[in-house]
């Protein structure tokens, strides 16, 4: 787990919370009263807040965590709870009777632990854990359209398509960092920003035949939550883990990889 995580108080402004999520690259921030856990705020929560409503406090948008754990709980049990709750991390408190926040444990933390212990996954190759029929966006889509698609589907990252080939990835973090959350819908931007302006390209990608462990290692190395699964990739010579373009087959997430180990 990550001990002593950055927290915000219940009366912290959403503007401050947004800057923390943007500047520190956090996916989630615990909300506390003193050191007592009250709730959490995720990037998804921030995306649902209008850019003009900066006077809202953290208590107004925080949600009760779906999973709360304690330091002594077995890591495999926590992993199953996180997967079943469809989340990527959980706050860690001192005990069931003491809600003092002591850390955060994420899917990435658990995967790193499994790799360090050289535990073998139950599914062996990427193709076995790949999700097909992927939700995508086009390189020339306005960010407002992608924002709506992420909000409607619950996906925090989408492959970017141009001429039927994947050329990049765009995530909630990219949109938050761009400063264009909701602005185009509220008249704050005269000319809508398009996906190609902020997407990450060339994307890190993987093929179906690769080992699940390889996917886990790439996710940890690049601190990414999902990998496009591709066919006929055109690799970057200096960075062979990235592709200039490829045919999109599916996508594999950290949760898919974790499920390959513990389900």
In which residue ranges do the predicted regions lie?
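The conserved cystathionine-beta-synthase
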Residues: 7-25, 32, 69-88, 93-96, ...
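Conserved catalytic/dimer-interface elements of ABC ATPase nucleotide-binding domains
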Residues: 30, 39, 91, 159, ...
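Short acidic/polar alpha-helix capping motifs at helix-coil junctions
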Residues: 11, 20-25, 40-45, 88-91, ...
